[in-house]
Amino acid sequence: SSHGKGKGTMIRRQRLKWLATLLMSFAISFSANAQELNATVTINHNQIQGTDASVFDNLKETLTNFLNDHQWTNLKFQKNERIVCNFNITVTKYDVATNMFTCKALIQANRPVFNSSYTTTFYNNTDNDFNFEFAQFDQLAFNEEVIDNQLTALCAYYAFLIIGMDLDTFSPMGGEDVLQRCMN
């Protein structure tokens, strides 16, 4: 009866192989779609009085999701390879009637230092003209062919700039193709 025992072991092995293959294909398809940015967005609206704060909370959530969930290039980034960046936006003026935001933004991006546990900042810039229209619950969509929204244009510009510069830190001219897209 040792013959029957071998057959059961073989079937279990085949099932395990099948399960392992299935799990690997899930992992690969998941990592293949990992976006490039790991952005943190903060909205400082202390200078704006008498406005419902929910519009600023919604802006923060919308920007965070847009920057992190949009696939900016066709490059494959693992989740742990995503570029850590910060968009610290200070609202200096907000017109409720026109949904116009006048802001300045401090944008920073970091990368890991090779063979160490710390990171270094490779991009740090203040944009004093980070101005756009945004109505609460607006959905942001980016089409590189037709840029019809100032907020998506600003996000795309900085996303391409950060990704391109990050690629340049790994190899000379490594980000040239992506940086070229900033000019569009």
Where do the model's predicted regions map?
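Start-of-domain marker
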Residues: Q35-T102, V113-N115
